[in-house]
């Protein structure tokens, strides 16, 4: 038996005592039983040959450099009978990991997440097995301690390689066994919808006598870049293994104009105020979104035009988060200034004024505008620091932008100041800024990393006022959240519609750390920006998932590469990556690492797919508003918007307000930020 060894600061294949990853003989599963055989090792050729009944399994290891090995597995049926089986490739850590990761799926056990979601390593005594299409690096698992990291993942160079699954098993001695299965399996259950587990899913390979099966995989060993950040090493290599080059389907100008078109379509008259409404969506959306409908009833309603008609049926108006009322309005204002459209500029300013007028003396306000008028309004919720953070940031940014064009609106600056003053006074050493608050100033939900959004609001307010208390409070908060969460490669609670580990909560920490680096010049903040960005991109798809001709992804030409998974509760892709483009480009500017540019371009190219344009407006038989885009892209056996999870590769019909706002924010930043304006990707 040989292994990946570490000696003299180099990784090699060998048989010594400095093992990091032990390379195991092949196994197959046949008729529900796992079988292995006699293995012959040839270190000179880098081969392990295992005989299992009539099968010969030959693994050839090729050194790809810096701890990365490509493995080519060839299975030949040398017998006289046809065999149906599942192939198992496995390695074992030679160290006891302190943490583990299945990207997009399981972040060290998903502590604090809901019971009917994948948590821990097992369920009902069996190891979780997840299909490749749930993970941003195919069938990837990673284990680490402070000294070493171990990862394996499938290649995307053939269908047989890619159609795979993965699992992790903790052994009695504290080591881990990491597995890749071919073909696809999900067990002991399929996580098929929001907090719903259904029956397992199994595929098998059949080989006739004389036939072969070939699949490629990778084994990776590293010394973690930072403690708990072996994923950073892995992601740097993944950027080379999987080409992230993509050609955007729209030009930046087209994306901007379509974003403005949709923001205008979202303008809504409500109780004498102009607001940005939450979305265009079908009436069926409410019951789908909360998974509050049976598959049978959903099937019935999907045939009823009353339920499937797309419209503005939900009177919800949120300051930040999912509706991005203020950000959309600021983008409308920027466009109106550029075009000389005074009427639209006044409308955009009016939206800000309506929100500012609701602020209490203590600085707080409801974060959903309709709650001032409808006590039992749809999606009623306590005010939260995600919205407060966006509110302070956008009021400060709008104040600055208007002032640069000769328009004084001190009310907007004062709004940000009062809101930030409240949280300077109510910051807690135990929970930071918390999550949800009453209007009276009581923290009713202290959990999560969501306070990063408020730290961003603090720094934008500091930029306007130069009051050092906002800078100091942001630094104090970041120290807290990094020490508790980010330094452990975890973020939670930013996605307000789930109880989950998620991606979007990392976004403000990238930006906040970059601002602090620019303000102080201290290296710790650049390292923190990198950490948050690596965590964010651990949710990114590095490859294109495979679909049949009947899939909507195939019909609409959607590619998963560059997309970012939502959370450990919501196993789908969204276009949130567009918001992180500018900070990723800033990281490239400050570090000189071009991989951040590649990542930014990939996220952008993914995020502009499926936008309704004059040439492409009809989806699911309905004409969508110009510039709209569905909120979710459902790449695996998980959905809330179909009666069965087997309809992999489909769009939903919730045409959200936030996605266009983030794209416009990024395009606006490209225009005004000299550091990144020449780094943006034009359509070829």
Annotate the PLM regions.
Residues 373-380, 396-468, 483, 518, ...:
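Active-site lining segments of carbohydrate-active enzymes
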Residues 326-342, 390-408, 453-467, 508-522, ...:
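Well-ordered alpha-helical scaffold segments within catalytic/enzyme domains
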Residues 225-317, 350, 354-371, 417, ...:
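Low-complexity, Ser/Thr/Pro/Gly-enriched N-terminal "stalk/linker" regions
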Residues 301-362, 376-386, 402-418, 472:
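Aromatic- and glycine-enriched glycan-recognition loops and surfaces
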Residues 230-269, 340-358, 404-426, 466-483, ...:
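Extended, well-ordered alpha-helical scaffold segments
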Residues 200-203, 304-325, 374-390, 434-453, ...:
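Solvent-exposed loop and edge beta-strand segments that line ligand/cofactor-binding
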Residues 262, 266, 270, 465, ...:
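Non-catalytic carbohydrate-binding regions of carbohydrate-active enzymes
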Residues 30-56, 60-212, 218-220:
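Beta-strand/loop-rich accessory regions of lumenal/periplasmic or secreted enzymes
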């Amino acid at each position: 038996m040989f292994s990946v060894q570490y000696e003299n600061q180099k990784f090699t294949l060998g048989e010594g005592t400095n093992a990091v990853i032990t390379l195991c003989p092949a196994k197959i599963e046949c008729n529900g039983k796992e079988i292995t055989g006699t293995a012959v090792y040839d270190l000179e050729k880098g081969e392990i040959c295992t005989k299992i009944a009539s099968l010969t399994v030959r693994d050839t290891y090729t050194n790809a450099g810096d701890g990365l090995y490509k493995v080519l597995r060839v299975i030949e049926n040398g017998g006289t009978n046809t065999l149906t089986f599942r192939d198992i490739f496995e390695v074992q850590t030679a160290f006891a990991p302190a943490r583990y990761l299945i990207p997009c799926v399981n972040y060290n056990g998903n502590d604090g997440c809901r019971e009917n979601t994948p948590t821990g390593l097992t369920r009902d005594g069996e190891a979780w097995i997840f299909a490749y299409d749930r993970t941003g690096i195919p069938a990837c698992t990673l284990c680490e301690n402070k000294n070493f990291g171990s990862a394996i993942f499938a290649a995307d160079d053939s269908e047989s390689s890619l159609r795979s699954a993965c699992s992790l098993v903790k052994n009695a001695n504290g080591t881990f066994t990491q597995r890749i299965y071919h073909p696809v399996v999900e067990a002991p259950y399929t996580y098929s919808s929001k907090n719903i587990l259904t029956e397992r899913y199994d595929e098998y390979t059949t080989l006739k006598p004389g036939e072969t099966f070939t699949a490629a995989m990778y084994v990776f060993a590293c010394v973690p870049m930072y403690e708990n950040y072996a994923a950073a090493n892995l992601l740097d290599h993944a950027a080379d293994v999987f080409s992230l080059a993509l050609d955007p389907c729209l030009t930046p100008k087209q994306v901007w104009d379509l974003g403005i078109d949709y923001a205008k379509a979202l303008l809504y008259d409500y109780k004498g105020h102009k607001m940005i409404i939450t979305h265009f969506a079908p009436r069926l959306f409410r019951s789908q979104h909360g998974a509050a409908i049976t598959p049978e009833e959903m099937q019935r309603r999907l045939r009823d035009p009353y339920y499937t008609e797309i419209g503005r049926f939900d009177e919800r108006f949120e300051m930040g988060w999912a509706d991005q009322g203020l950000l959309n309005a600021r983008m409308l204002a920027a466009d109106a200034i550029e075009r000389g459209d005074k009427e639209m500029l006044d409308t955009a300013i009016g939206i800000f004024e309506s929100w500012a007028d609701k602020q209490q003396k203590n600085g707080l306000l409801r974060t959903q505008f309709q709650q001032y008028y409808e006590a039992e309004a749809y999606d009623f919720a306590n005010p939260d620091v995600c919205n407060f953070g966006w509110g302070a940031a956008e009021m400060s940014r709008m104040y600055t932008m208007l002032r640069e064009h000769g328009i004084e609106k001190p009310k907007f600056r004062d709004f940000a100041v009062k809101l930030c003053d409240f949280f300077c006074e109510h910051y807690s050493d135990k929970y930071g800024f918390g999550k949800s608050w009453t209007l009276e100033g009581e923290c009713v939900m202290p959990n999560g990393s969501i306070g990063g959004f408020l730290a961003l609001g603090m720094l934008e307010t500091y930029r306007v006022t130069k009051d050092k208390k906002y800078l100091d409070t942001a630094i104090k908060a970041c120290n807290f959240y990094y020490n508790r969460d980010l330094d452990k490669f975890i973020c939670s609670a930013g996605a307000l519609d789930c109880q989950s580990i998620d991606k979007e909560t990392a976004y403000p920490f990238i930006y906040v750390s970059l601002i602090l680096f620019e303000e102080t010049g201290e290296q710790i903040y650049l390292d923190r920006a990198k950490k948050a960005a690596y965590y964010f991109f651990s949710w990114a798809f590095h490859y294109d998932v495979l679909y049949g001709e009947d899939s909507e992804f195939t019909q609409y030409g959607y590619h998963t590469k560059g997309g970012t998974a939502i959370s450990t509760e919501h196993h789908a892709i969204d276009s949130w990556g567009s918001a992180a483009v500018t900070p990723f480009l800033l990281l490239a500017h400050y570090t000189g690492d071009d991989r951040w540019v590649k990542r930014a371009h990939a996220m952008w190219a993914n995020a502009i797919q499926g936008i309704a344009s004059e040439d492409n407006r009809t989806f699911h038989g309905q004409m969508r508003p110009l510039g709209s885009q569905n909120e979710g892209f459902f790449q695996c056996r998980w959905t809330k918007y179909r009666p069965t999870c087997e309809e992999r590769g489909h769009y939903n019909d919730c045409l959200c307000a936030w996605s266009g706002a983030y794209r416009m924010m990024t395009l606006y930043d490209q225009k005004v930020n000299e550091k990144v304006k020449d780094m943006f990707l034009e359509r070829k």
